[in-house]
Amino acid sequence: MMQFTSSYFRQVLLALCVAFALSSCVISRENVIVLERQGSFTAGGTVISTPGTFDSIADGAFSPADQSTAGQTLHGDHAFVFYQIPVDARPLPLVFWHGYGQSMKTWQTTPDGREGFQNIFLRQRYPVYLLDQPRRGQAGRSTEPTTISAATNDQLWFGIFRLGVGSELYPGVQFSPEPAALDQFYRQMTPDTGPLNIELNTKAVSALFDTIGPGILVTHSHSGGMGWLTALKNDNIMAIASYEPGSGFVFPEGEVPEPIPYVRGALRASAVSLEEFRRLTEIPIVIYYGDNIPNQPVENPGQDQWRASLTMAKAWRDVVNRRGGDVTLVHLPEVGLTGNTHFPMSDLNNLAVAELLSNWLKEKGLD
């Protein structure tokens, strides 16, 4: 009869462990995103200086209470860019620009822990560039001072971002009911570290496209209007996909619509020359809006301001298209996607939202 020693059992156990580990690796590799390269850089920016002479001996020690700035410079007001290039990448990258009070976190892991647009489109072999605009997030080095408020305003943004009213989620909303998800959502808000400067922001993002070449700009909310202005500056922007642009719509001189009133405010458009405006007729553009946006004025300001934005966006689409442009506006409930907040890219149905964009890119020959 064969005798089994403890050494024999150890060898068998080791072999089984190795086999299990290898099989696990094979299974998990199906979900691996393989990158050719990744990295980061800054784009745009300014340099300011203080007159005088810097004395590296007398003034070379860090002394916050009595620090001389004479003869020194400050590099700031740039965008910060993080990029990932997948293996066998598609030719045109997607450049993702966040909205007001946000950073590149908008496009990364969702508040409830699922993959965001960053990974979703990497899996589709698109090069992905995420940016923090000047004076925001990782681009916080500002050449102008500001005061950062510590106001308690979470519930204000809960309503404006159309998660619900007060602290109650809308019925059927595409946001996780788990308290931890809402906690994560609130914590992705981030302040401006300097005065908001539209021209500064658009120059920085234009410089980004100067660096990377042709690509597709994907904007959200406040960056929507800045996206149109950036396209006026840079022919490397081959298309724009805009999620819930809230303001900053530009029309040809003489065709600016009347302001659209909403609760406690009014949405105004601005004018550019017809020559500048024609640039927006030369590229395909798609605009997406989510749910819980009324057709008529309502008392809820968190909904009513988006009614004004959607109304203005429709007028803008019509003006661009009348001049030979190619603007598509998609109201998600009208195509069967209900419950979306102001953040469709991180909502529970973000895979379906991403599929709409993927299909549009293919339809326009941008894939």
Predicted regions, residues:
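Catalytic active-site module of serine/aspartate enzymes centered on a nucleophile-bearing elbow/loop
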Residues: 339, 343-367
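Conserved alpha/beta-hydrolase
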Residues: 114-140
